[in-house]
Amino acid sequence: MQRSKSSLAALTLGAIGVVYGDIGTSVLYAVKEVFGSGHVAFTPQNVYGVLSILFWTLTTIVSLKYVVLVLRADNNGEGGLIAMLALASQAVKDKPRLRSALLGIGVFGTSLFYGDGVITPAISVLSAVEGLEVVSPHFGKAVIPLTLIVLFCLFAVQKRGTSGIGRYFGPVTLVWFTSIAALGVPHIVGHPEILGALSPHHALGFIWRSPGTSFIILGAVVLCVTGAEALYADLGHFGKKPIRLAWFSVAMPALTINYFGQGALLLAEPEAVKNPFYMMAPDWALIPLVIMATMATVIASQALITGAFSVTKQVIQLGYLPRLNILHTSVRDTGQIYIPFVNWALFLAIVLAVVMFRSSSNLAAAYGIAVTLDMLITTVLTFFVIRYGWRYPLALCIAATGFFFLVDLAFFGSNLLKLLQGGWFPLMIGSIVFMLMMTWKRGRELLNEKLRADAIDLRDFLTAVFVNPPTRVDGTAVFLTAEPGAVPNALLHNLKHNKVLHQQNLFVTVRNHEVPWIGLDKRLQVEALGGDCWQVMVHYGFKNDPDLPGALALMRGRGCELESMTTSYFLSRDVVTPTIGSGMAPWREKLFAQMHHNASGAAGFLNLPSNSVVELGSKIEI
């Protein structure tokens, strides 16, 4: 019992750092942007109304939608949009058109994650460093350079991994939540009447009096739920109970106290609207607060960067992006990975955002479209999971998700008003990633169709070969093939040029499935072909780490004995040539060919020993 309590405490502390780091830093800019937009007349009544809307937004979207409803839709203990997409896809697998539509929606939602991933670190770190302007206006010119230095250092250390410093994320973020709550308490004590804004009638009254203004300011109010989707995305790391406990015991109370403290300050000092968070603090605490805020925003950004690596790996395994160079940064934790291309592409996009928008207020205009559309997509997928996966009655499904759908739609509609002010930026990034994903997926389909059309039946081929068998050499040859039952090009090249066949031959096809994990008991499907040849299907979930030698070691005891020192892996390296009249526009064919050319080899992705790999090239027209 004592051990389970300490384990729960450790997981809860970890969740505070990783799950709630992003939403915890929203206090830096949310209230400032609502009143700084110029749409809300600065009156005590409006302060009450805005605070009430902020509180009930947190309650509705985070507490009710994500913590209560969405966390229930786990995929074998895993969360995130890809896990939800896999659940929804499986739930409607007998409805191919609906399944295709949901896959398209889900992939688009996943691509929007990268758009959000550019804005969030930029606005978080920039808003923290902007606290220096409150210390002294002379620091204003240093804000952009300091922000870029902090961001560069953050991305530069990624290749070393975060397993060492990761253990401090929870404690530091807990100190942050304690600090922001402590900032708010004196101001609430000075104006306890501000707690009246907890009543929803202030929010409803504001909406009733100013429906147009209410709709417009939702584009700024959404800043208070930045990172809400992390609750679901990190489900597999921490579990439901620690995430819920961390929210209701630490994050939600601290955020509420700080927001209401800012509201109390604005009632007493309306001029504090230019930066109410930092102006709550006494002068002596400003520099330490800027340092603490910068640390908190770096931790929040780190969680997002780690998430980008994880999502990219999952998308690659589902076949929507080409293989990239993936490095493991921890021997003990296989989930700790580093993808150089994603790291520096994200860094350059964030630098572009900081240089283009130059302030957290300008970046606030860019924030919202991608994340609210993601939230909307999550609600849609949740409906199909509980309707077709859990088989709940239609009326109950509509009741459970309909309200959240309308709330998400209102926030998305409001953020569309910011499209020209900056909302186009994350939407553009998401659209580019979506185009790349769909081009790769369609290109692979065309490539596989071409391979199937030209394929030679493996059984018939082996029967013909064994009529007049070539020289057999010691050892095992592993031939990778995209289609089971087809002769791999590498085998044809090997017989043509070397005129030998190994003593044991495995024809291996790797399949990735729309489930997070596939256990070792279901890893292999083996079919004997005769003549010491086997057809092997290797199955992985999108969160499994592909390790082909490790998987093939399970062949022992099935009539095939593999020795690592005498096993060679034969891979076909296809050179794709675009042709006129295929299933894609010419520019997409050329793009696919370039992506295929730049893709990392299968050897590294499948963890093959480099000194045992033989690559043989072939040219394919699509």
UniProtKB/Swiss-Prot annotation:
Sorted alphabetically, which InterPro entries does this protein's record hold?
Answer: K+_transporter, K_trans_C, K_trans_N, Kup
Where's it mainly located?
Answer: membrane
Q: Which GO terms describe its molecular function?
A: potassium ion transmembrane transporter activity; symporter activity
Q: Name one GO cellular component term.
A: plasma membrane
Keyword RNA-binding in the entry? The reply is no
Query: Does this UniProt record's set of keywords contain Ion transport?
Result: yes
Name the chemical reaction catalysed here: K(+)(in) + H(+)(in) = K(+)(out) + H(+)(out)
Topology with respect to the bilayer: Multi-pass membrane protein
According to the record, the segments passing through the membrane are 8-28, 50-70, 103-123, 137-157, 169-189, 215-235, 247-267, 285-305, 337-357, 366-386, 393-413, 419-439
The cross-references to Pfam families, in alphabetical order and at most eight, read:
K_trans, K_trans_C
UniProt subcellular location = Cell inner membrane
**Record keywords:** Cell inner membrane, Cell membrane, Ion transport, Membrane, Potassium, Potassium transport, Symport, Transmembrane, Transmembrane helix, Transport
Listed HAMAP family: Kup
Q: According to its UniProt record, which protein family does this protein belong to?
A: Belongs to the HAK/KUP transporter (TC 2.A.72) family.
Q: What does this protein do?
A: Transport of potassium into the cell. Likely operates as a K(+):H(+) symporter.
Q: What is this protein called?
A: Probable potassium transport system protein Kup
User: Native species of this protein?
Assistant: Paracidovorax citrulli (strain AAC00-1)
Q: What is the lineage of its organism?
A: Bacteria, Pseudomonadati, Pseudomonadota, Betaproteobacteria, Burkholderiales
Recorded name of the encoding gene: kup
